[in-house]
Amino acid sequence: MSAVGSSNPEYVVARVRARRGSLYGDEEYRKLTRMGPAEIARFMEESSYGTEINALGSLHGGVDLIEYALNRNLAGQFDDILDWSEGSLYGLIARYLRKFDAWNVKTVIRGVYTDADQSEIEVDLIRAGEFDDRRIRRLLEADSIDAVVEVLEDTIYGDPLREAYAEYEETGVLVPLENAVDRAFYERLLSGLGNDEPTRQYEAFLKAEVDFRNAANALRLARSGADIDPAAYFIEGGELFTRGSLARLARNLDELVEYIADSQYGDELGPALRELEEANSLIAFEHATDAALLAYGDQLGTIHPVSVTPVISYILAKEREVENIRAIARGKEAGLSADEIESELVIT
């Protein structure tokens, strides 16, 4: 509602907890993995996605209908949370939701890079951040990566993307651009937070998110064997790595895995690290970090039940629900078995 005035966490948390009760659980996911796209859409119509399915049903069908409905519902849910919020609580939530601006920027860049149709790019956009419809439209109309950078010149992504663009032109790979977007988002997210205990705990959660992003980037670089300076992709704000330690560890996969296993995240990520060693599965590791963040958010929401943390915990859980449903729909479209699809889901 407004960043001015006093916060109202009691009211917002109560509304969010009511919404959380309608999220899909294990039983719903198991049912969905055994349905086709049309059945999934009908199932969604009988749940919290009914408004979106009905509104979009005459325009889209199959997996496209599911994806458009998911993204519209997600944006609507988060707009509601902002409408309920006031004061510093509004500011913290709005700042976190700008992650979807970062998502949209990277989605457009990837789409332009692969010469995807505008409609193919648009279906993956989530309009839950700060960017208005006009900027989203300008991004979708950009016909080159340089044009995308130009659209963003007056945002926090402008200067970092312009600097990274030179390296992109030299290498032809998107990693410098994508990491420039992530660094800009997280550095802004972690700046100027409050000093009360709940906010300090929230800051610890954000630092864990940065740690997991740095760990995934380091593992990706270590596995690639590419001659890339890992320090160039370091995101400030976490506690697990320094720029120097990330650069050193990313050159040796075994040392990096051991370092993460011996860290404060070892218990949560241990099984995924073993799978990474045995099956070379980075996806399993990334799923494990997602699950660990969900669990961490839930834990903080219990410790500080009247603060921003239960709200952020719900945002993560809702985002994960959307990703799970999307994975099921796309898996069905690709002809994957129920077991193969279930391996792609993050369920806590």
UniProtKB/Swiss-Prot annotation:
GO terms for biological process: proton motive force-driven plasma membrane ATP synthesis. It is a peripheral membrane protein. Gene3D superfamilies: ATP synthase (C/AC39) subunit, domain 3 (1.10.132.50), V-type ATP synthase subunit C domain (1.20.1690.10). The keyword Cell membrane applies. One of its GO terms (molecular function) is ATP binding. InterPro entries: ATPase_csu/dsu_sf, ATPase_V0-cplx_csu, ATPase_V0-cplx_csu/dsu, V-ATPase_V0D/AC39_subunit, V-type_ATPase_csu/dsu, V-type_ATPase_csu/dsu_dom_3. Keywords: ATP synthesis, Cell membrane, Hydrogen ion transport, Ion transport, Membrane, Transport. It holds the Pfam family vATP-synt_AC39. It is found in: Cell membrane. GO terms for cellular component: plasma membrane; proton-transporting V-type ATPase, V0 domain. HAMAP family: ATP_synth_C_arch (MF_00314). Belongs to the V-ATPase V0D/AC39 subunit family. Has multiple subunits with at least A(3), B(3), C, D, E, F, H, I and proteolipid K(x). Component of the A-type ATP synthase that produces ATP from ADP in the presence of a proton gradient across the membrane. This is A-type ATP synthase subunit C.
